[in-house]
Amino acid sequence: MRQDIILKPWQIELTTNSTNDNFEESTFFTGNGRMGIRGYLPFWQEKRTFETGLFVAGIFGEIKPGITDFVNLPTPVWGNIECDGHPITLSSPVSSTLDMKTGVRSQSFLAKSGESTLNIEHHVFCSMSDPSLLVQRLSFSASRTSNISVHAGIHTACCNCPVPDDQVKENHETIKLAEPAQHDMCKDSVDCTFSILGTGLIVREQMFFHTSFSDSEDYISDDSLGKQWHGILQSGQKLVLEITTRITTSRDIDPLIGSNEISDTYDELFAKSSLAWTSRWSESDIEIDGAPDDQSAVRYNIFQLITSCSARDSSVSIGARGLTHTRYKGCYFWDTDLFMLSFFLYTHPEAAKSLMEYRVRTLPQAKENAKKMNNAGARYPWMTSFDGSEQCESWDIGASELHITADIPFAMQQYFDATGDENFHLQAMEVYIETARFWYSRCIIHPDGSADLMFCKGPDEYCGITNNNLFTNCMVKFNLDLAIKAALRLREAYPNRYSKLSLCDEEVLAWHSLRDNLKECRDPQTGRYLPDETFTRLEPVDIKTLKTDDGASYHHVCFDRLQRYQVIKQADTLLLMSRLPKKFTLEERLNAWEDFEPCCLHDSTLSFASHALFAAQNGLQEAAEKYFKKALYLDLHEIMNNTGKEGLHLACLGETWSSIFFGFLGATFDGDTPVFSPVLPSGWKALRMNFYWRGESYRLMVFEGRYSISRI
């Protein structure tokens, strides 16, 4: 756990003596949604080939046949400084600042070389006005007149160290996924093209340099290329080097790419990017009175959701770690659809549509995946990357974590309900129908009409391979209901589409029967809901014997053993009830909390926020606030001791936002007008925010339990 980040209204700050603090590198990530860069210290002689972290959405390379990794690209945020012919050494702590209002990360420190002390500052941002631009400014001064040498360019030796899917295994073998194909050196620029292993993708990095210090010379070595400058720096004189890099790829579709000039100055590009950030914050900010640390942390969560969403590119989604790390090979999970979508849906509907269109685009791969599993229709893979094919290498998870195929139609319907986007709804209807076909072929339907869903896992991955997981079965029923309504709508209004999908009344009636007869597990004595058929047969255990802090228990308890204890990894039944609250009575929801909250290990970073949301929705304010604090500061305080090692947890960021909007603010959208029932966390005196609903923008203000809402 860490508590050394200083929180300010629009900034976070950290001072450290380390030049390679992976916690800082994760938390001080900055980006623009299309690309981003971890908060490592540049212009330092230490070369960390796989630990830097420059990522562009959708750029994956093949590490084995059919399996990809998120490419750690050759980074232009790199260089070194020499003074009087000697490398510099750190002589003060490194001070880092992340400005969330503008996306600029700043780092400053003192360095010594011989008798000279250098005061070094570095600023970097990824432009929000032109998502292909990465902009830097390096400046430093010397305590005495010194002979200075500066190298800047592209660290071409960057590589990947693929992280195994298994959370208790480690890998130390690296693989280079971006090979230089060609380069061109001009007076004030460097242009280098890289080919990505196995996927045929091309990445181009064009660097433009501006400094008045001296003329540049070309610099090429085995692991880098760029420019170098030599000259005398007078005592008190400041050397300023501005570097703008345009990063383009062979798969770009964002219309804003190339909209700014690479030759513009740092200040000119900063002004344009800041204007775009101002617009984005006007849609997304949550203003809180009375809780300054929470205010900063909420803005941090929002900032990091924005910086990992390529809002205008529907060929990509958001990985479990966004653009902040290669954990889980950068793949897209159900995290996006169930935990992140709501934030974008109510603050940036265009981005939400893009995320849903990614699932429409990959429907053919989902159909192929179902076919491989000897099923009909479409089964969405558990983990996907650039082409929508299955990337999960854990056979039990990949084969049995079926619920994603129902989660995606659920998310699509959420998008339609909030926007009324009829054109998208027509596309979504095909997804509803093809996924319903999968469920009908995957379930076991008995002669009496009853049905079971066998060999599955719900969100609680500690249940072993089980039968009739309640979360999955109820989401399947929701999916089937969507398909039934879609089929009727197509038959009446779009008969050609109905015919093209080979629909018939008999198939739709079969979905009716499955929806009505698929099993929901209950305790035969009490009638209370159960997570699945096997939960009560597992061995009870005092969870205090399994863990003593908020770190995951699987680091010291064998995973096989965890599968046989009566414990829950993360919200499962409670998650279902937060997503489909109308299906359950308040008594049923509170009974579920009483039954399952005490035995939850919270071994997933999804869990705290989901419990906060459920508790806030159901009047459990004290518990809601307890879990909300853990979720809100999960990364900023490294609550689970894995932020530095694995990157930021985007699903937690998204669900934390939902715990505010749907939990503490009590947002509901049953009719044409949004309704709220706010109960703010302790210390929050007032709250203000904007949101979208069905094409309208609204302003919400909450004060002392009252609220007002107005159209903007």
Please describe what each predicted stretch is.
Residues 1-26, 30-31, 35-40, 44-327, ...:
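Acidic/polar, glycine-enriched structural segments that form the non-catalytic walls/loops
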Residues 324-332, 378-425, 434-513, 707:
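The feature captures the catalytic groove of carbohydrate-active enzymes
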Residues 330-361, 410, 488, 503-645:
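Active-site core of glycosidic bond-cleaving carbohydrate-active enzymes
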Residues 288-295, 311-313, 346-356, 416-430, ...:
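Structural helix-adjacent loops and short alpha-helical linkers that scaffold large soluble proteins
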Residues 78, 87, 291-299, 336-381:
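Carboxylate/His-rich catalytic cores and anion/metal-binding grooves
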